[in-house]
Amino acid sequence: VRRTKSESEETRQRILDAAETVFLDIGVSRASLDRIATEAGVTRGAIYWHFANKQELFAAMIERVHGQHEAVVASSFLNGSDPLDGILKWALKVIELFVAEAHTRQVYRIVVTRCEYVGEMQHALEWQCDLHDRMAVNMRNAFEAAAAAGQLAPDWTVKSAATTLECFMSGMLDNWLRYDFDAEVAETLRAGLRSLVGSFRARDCAAHPSAVQQGRALHA
C-alpha cells in the first residue's frame, strides 16, 4: 500500500510537470486535459483521479511552488524589535527566490503571461486574490507594528506605505516575468528596495546595525 501511495504521488507530480510544460507552450486556455495527459504519459482518467478539472490542476500547480515558500517568506515579517527591517528582509527574500529558482519563475510566468482569467478560469483568479489578501494582511500588520513602534516617517501612513511597497513589488515581479531580468537588474532592484523602505523610516529611528547586515547578507 505504501508503494501504491508513493506511485500515486509520483503520478500526480508528473501530471503537474506536464501541465506546466503545456501551459507554458500553448497557454492555459488552449491546453486540454488530453494534451496534458499525453505529455505526462498517463490517461485522462489518471488526471481526473487527482484533479477534478483544469482549474484545480492550475491551482495545484501554483500551490506547489507558493506553498513551500509562503511560510518561509512570511516569517521575515516577524521582527518585533524592528518591523521595518522585517519588511525589507521579506522583500529581499522574494527577489532571492526569483533569482535562485527557475522553476518558481516558470510557474509565475504562466500565471502572469499565459492565462486569461475569464470563463472557466475565473475561479483561479479568485484563488489568487485570496493569496494576495494573505500577503497584504502580513504587510499591513508589519507596517502597523512599525507605526506603533514610532518607526514610520510622518510623510507615510500605514495604508500609503503598504500600498506603495505592494505596487513596487507587483510591478517589479510582473516585468521580471515578462522580460527576464538579469543579475545586474536584480541588484538594482535590491538597492531600490532599500531606498524605498529607508524612506518609510523616521529619521530619529535608525535601523539596528545587525538588522542592516542581515538584510545585505540575503544576497551575499
Protein language model features and the residues they cover:
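N-terminal intrinsically disordered/low-complexity leader segments
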Residues: V1-E10, D204-A220
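Basic, helix-initiating cap at the start of DNA-binding domains
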Residues: V1-I26, R30-V42, E56-A59
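Base-recognition residues in the alpha-helical recognition helix of bacterial helix-turn-helix
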Residues: L24, Y48-A52, A60, R64
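Key DNA-contact positions within bacterial/archaeal DNA-binding proteins
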Residues: G45
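Hydrophobic alpha-helical connector segments
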Residues: A60, A74-Q106, V158-L165, C205-A206, ...
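Hydrophobic alpha-helical bundle segments that form small-molecule/ligand-binding pockets
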Residues: L78-G80, Q122, H132-A161, W176, ...
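Short secondary-structure transition hinges
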Residues: E96-N141, Q151
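Hydrophobic alpha-helical segments that form the core
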Residues: I110, W156-N175, E187-L196, H219
